[in-house]
Amino acid sequence: MVRTRKWMLSTTIIAMSSSNSEQKVDVAKLSPEEQKLFRLYGRLPQRKDLLVQKLQQGRKYFDSGDYALNKAGKASDSGITCIGKEIPSPDTIPHRVVSAGSPNKEPSLHTKRPSESSPSGASSRRESVTRHDLESNEN
């Protein structure tokens, strides 16, 4: 009978809850995980679901701006913008299409200006420089 009494004392433990009221806990009826928690912390965890408890507390805000937007009834940009969702490819980037008769057509970088392409303009410049040099040398 002494053995059974020791066994009963070891399986029925009086635990102190957070409200400091005594509560009898039968360790034999607990699951192995609950027994481990009871041995480590000396009390059983609360039975409330953590996710439900967090949802009931209300939304947590990133900063005061999000809080102010929510109080004002305006949407924050958490679901509206889609920055960084997709890596752009040449097929998905809109390109400007220039028609042949468009007045907004930009000149090509490889075409020469009319003043540079005419050989007569270049030769007349050379002649004026040489005349100037000759006149200055004569004086």
From Swiss-Prot:
Gene Ontology terms, MF aspect: protein phosphatase inhibitor activity; protein serine/threonine phosphatase inhibitor activity
Domain of life: Eukaryota
Region (Disordered): 83-139
GO cellular component terms given for this protein: cytoplasm; cytosol; nucleus
Keyword terms, alphabetized: Cytoplasm, Nucleus
Location in the cell: Nucleus; Cytoplasm
Family of this protein: Belongs to the endosulfine family.
Name used for this protein in its record: mRNA stability protein mug134
Protein species of origin: Schizosaccharomyces pombe (strain 972 / ATCC 24843) (Fission yeast)
